Each structure stands twice: as structure tokens, then as C-alpha cells.
Amino acid sequence: MVVGGIRALLEQALHPEAMSGVAAHSNFREDAWGRLQRTGDYVSTLTFGTREETEKLTSRVRAIHSKLGLDDPHLLLWVHMAMVDSFLDTALRSGMKIEESEQDQYISEMVTFAQLVGIEASEVPTNQIGRAHV
């Protein structure tokens, strides 16, 4: 998860608006490791937490994004799909044997994750074909 997470952050930084938001509103310059840890905790909670924990956390994140004007659906989708792409790609490159149907299932299951951060389900890819077009 660590390698996939770092890859996701690097891919997310390729979007000028995402990087602009991070530069303007994140403390990553002063506390890079702390910021990385908090991001890891966020992903871990959404992956392994209870529904109550995930809803509480994502509600907080949505409120922060809204307050800062960082709730653009296109941008949120970019960040989400960079994470999905990174975790899947890292797993495959590490030698995990994941059938195409299982890859599609993972991408489809991540729609719930996207909805929790405020992305409309209809906007989120549910398979490899959709993943390739974001």
C-alpha cells in the first residue's frame, strides 16, 4: 500500500489544479512525513474502517474541500482514479496475479470510495476500459 500510495501522490501531482490546491492549503513542506502518514491513515480507514468511521472521515474531508473550493468533480475524479490506478498498477507490477475480471471488480468496488468523497457514481469508471480514459 505504501508504494501504491506514493505513486498515487506523484500521479495526482501531475494535475495542475491538484498541485495548486496542495501547494496553497497543505503543510507538506513543513511536515512531509506527517502529511504522508495522514494520507495513509485516510486510505487505510476508507479501506479497512467501519462504515461509521469512513462516513465521519469523508464528511470532514468533503467539508474541508468545500470550504477551500477544492470540490470540483473533475478534480476529485482525477485524484480518485490516480489512487485506483496506482494501487492496481503497483499490485500487478509486484507480481500479483489478478485476473481481468478481478481488476474490473476492484475498480467497480472503488466507486463506493469515490461516492464517499462526493463524486457521482455515474461519473466513476467501473472497469479497465473506463479507467484508461480518465
Report each predicted region and the residues it spans.
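Mature, function-bearing regions of proteins
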Residues: 1-131
